[in-house]
Amino acid sequence: MISRYLRWQVLGSFMGKLLFAERDGVQVLKLIGDVRVTLGPTISTFLTRLGESKTFKSIIIDLTETQGIDSTSLGLLAKISLTTQETFGTIPTIISPNEDITRILESMGFDKVFVILKELVTECGQLGELNTEIVSESKLRKQVLDAHRVLMSLNERNRGEFQDLVQALEHERVGEPAEQRDRVA
């Protein structure tokens, strides 16, 4: 299904980068390196495009080269799963050979919203590079807030873990001018 002919696009940052490939409705999102909040806008744009896809059949999130991943990025991945299930009626797959990362995924409840496998069956093709998206601080704050709300919705452990952060971010948003809050999608 996924072959060496897949077209890759790189969505990157200084610490980590995202690679994307699509073929015959199968979309692959590969996270490389240390994936942090700075990649949030890029993941959000991917999520928007995914929801608008007319050819979507399935998605694979490849963590084979992921060294670290923060909670904002995890929340956005969870949002990809929930959106995919809601919009297309399919459960995404995560490839995670790193036991430490797999343990984090399972503790966050990802085993309830993803199929988690240890290896990708075939290699994907040539890589091409794209720029990382830069967004305003208020938009980034909203993405962090939304990502953590999604994580909180997965299980009670997450709710307890991220409740203080979400409340702090909500409090910061209250202090923003209304036109700035309303502008943030």
Q: What positions do the PLM features span?
A:
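STAS-like cytosolic regulatory interaction modules
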Residues: 2-65, 82-185
